[in-house]
């Protein structure tokens, strides 16, 4: 309590200083002004990311595999932010530090639709697989991975690709015919390609005709849309990229990883989602055959990967824990993962449901119209909702199941040149 006015000594006898009123408050409020307050963050295991702005400027360290089992129950991440928010720099700096901290215990695979990871790949000895129509590098999304469910995976992939070309779901006969073709080829035990699937559909074996309970002419008529769709995939959309056996060699045992450059088809809005679907399928099948290393899988422009293959892609995410793969979905807006099929259908619900398989949400600055969308998708508090529209460049809200913090990514001078896309463009 402040002493009564008559009890105060004359001003020449008073000690210098500022008289402060007594105030009582809880630590929930005082933590924001108390200079010695720090947040334990997530511990110090994993590479250093930056400064925990909401935790007294303590360090922020992160590795999805180190946190698995106590802070996380799945290793997948989503990174979303407006253009120029520092999204690309954060991801590249994280990958660079993962390779520096863990060496060959980590493998980095990057699906790069825009071709912006080429300098990063050169600096870290990551080979670049450049896919373009008429090229020499080919990946076979029908490659076998030795699982009992392999036939089912390949059937789903074929269905997703053909549905994407047709722009509609397959009817019962089309779906059955395509499934029969894949299972027939799978039973041979030999490696087959999409071209083999097309040939089998166009000229079905007698047992397939008998199984369909239709005449050869009726079956041929029913199969016509599928035949034309597969022909378009092989002669245009996937030509020279996914129409033959895998021709690239990857060091799965000791190599640091690789980049798949899809920039040749980035401007083709019809082809890019199908190419992304085929590439992610090949990547998932390959990674699941080599499960002795922890893998960081980056899917840039993730909206394209789920546009036609949400169900197929969700299946891969669910297997991340089994095969030691942390998938990072990178997009401008969180709504990108659901807006492609936001029509109330089962596929739309699956697209939105992808977020349930992603426990680490890294949200950089959002444009005003996306703040309500992000708040709903990520179940943000009112305070967090206010933050994400005002975050400074390089600053992100990290949301984990039991922890949340605003973190400023800290870049070295080398990383600013190598990882920061905007800096590289301005120099």
Mark where each language-model region is.
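Short helix/loop capping segments that flank catalytic or ligand/cofactor-binding pockets
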Residues: 60, 70-72, 88, 119, ...
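Structured core elements
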Residues: 48, 61, 78, 109-110, ...
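Conserved P-loop NTPase motor cores
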Residues: 72-85, 92-96, 111, 263-387, ...
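Basic- and hydrophobic-enriched, low-structure N-terminal and domain-boundary segments
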Residues: 1-80, 414
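P-loop NTPase motor domains
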Residues: 31-54, 118-127, 133, 140-325, ...
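Switch/connector loops and helix/strand junctions flanking conserved nucleotide-binding motifs
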Residues: 117-120, 137-140, 336-340, 370-374, ...
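Glycine-rich phosphate-binding loop of nucleotide-binding enzymes
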Residues: 47-133
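P-loop NTPase motor core of the ASCE superfamily
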Residues: 150-196, 342-427
């Amino acid at each position: 309590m402040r002493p009564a006015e008559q009890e105060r000594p004359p001003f020449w006898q008073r000690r210098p200083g500022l008289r402060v009123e007594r105030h009582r408050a809880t630590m929930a409020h005082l933590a924001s002004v108390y200079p010695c307050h720090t947040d334990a963050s997530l511990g110090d295991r994993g590479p250093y990311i930056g400064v925990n702005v909401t935790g007294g400027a303590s360090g922020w360290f992160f590795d999805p595999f180190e946190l698995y089992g106590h802070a996380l129950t799945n290793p997948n991440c989503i990174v979303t932010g407006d253009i120029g928010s520092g999204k690309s720099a954060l991801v590249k700096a994280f990958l660079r530090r993962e390779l520096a901290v863990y060496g060959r215990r980590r493998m980095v695979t990057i699906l790069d639709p825009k071709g912006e990871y080429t300098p990063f790949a050169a600096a870290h000895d990551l080979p670049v697989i450049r896919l373009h129509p008429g090229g020499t590098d080919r990946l076979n999304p029908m490659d076998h991975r030795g699982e009992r469910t392999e036939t089912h995976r390949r059937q789903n992939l074929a269905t997703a690709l053909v549905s994407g070309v047709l722009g509609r779901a397959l009817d019962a006969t089309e779906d059955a015919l395509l499934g029969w073709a894949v299972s027939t080829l799978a039973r041979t035990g030999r490696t087959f390609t999409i071209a083999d699937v097309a040939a089998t559909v166009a000229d079905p074996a007698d047992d397939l005709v008998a199984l369909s309970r239709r005449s050869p002419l009726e079956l041929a008529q029913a199969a016509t849309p599928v035949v034309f769709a597969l022909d378009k995939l092989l002669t245009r959309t996937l030509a020279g990229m996914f129409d033959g056996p895998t021709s690239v060699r990857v060091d799965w045992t000791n190599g640091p990883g690789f980049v798949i450059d899809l920039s040749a088809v980035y401007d083709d809005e019809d082809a890019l989602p199908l190419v992304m679907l085929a590439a992610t399928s090949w990547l998932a099948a390959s990674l699941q055959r080599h499960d002795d290393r922890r893998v960081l899988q980056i899917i840039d422009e993730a909206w394209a990967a789920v546009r036609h293959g949400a169900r197929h892609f969700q299946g891969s995410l669910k297997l991340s824990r089994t095969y030691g793969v942390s998938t990072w979905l990178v997009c401008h807006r969180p709504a990108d993962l659901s807006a492609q099929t936001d029509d109330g259908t089962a596929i739309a619900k699956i697209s939105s449901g992808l977020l349930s398989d992603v426990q680490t949400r890294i949200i950089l600055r959002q444009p005003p119209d996306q703040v309500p969308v992000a708040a709903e998708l990520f179940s943000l508090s009112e305070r967090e909702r206010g933050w994400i529209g005002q975050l400074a460049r390089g600053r992100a809200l990290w949301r984990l199941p039991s922890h949340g913090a605003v973190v400023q990514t800290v870049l070295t001078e080398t990383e600013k040149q190598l990882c920061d896309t905007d800096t590289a463009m301005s120099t």
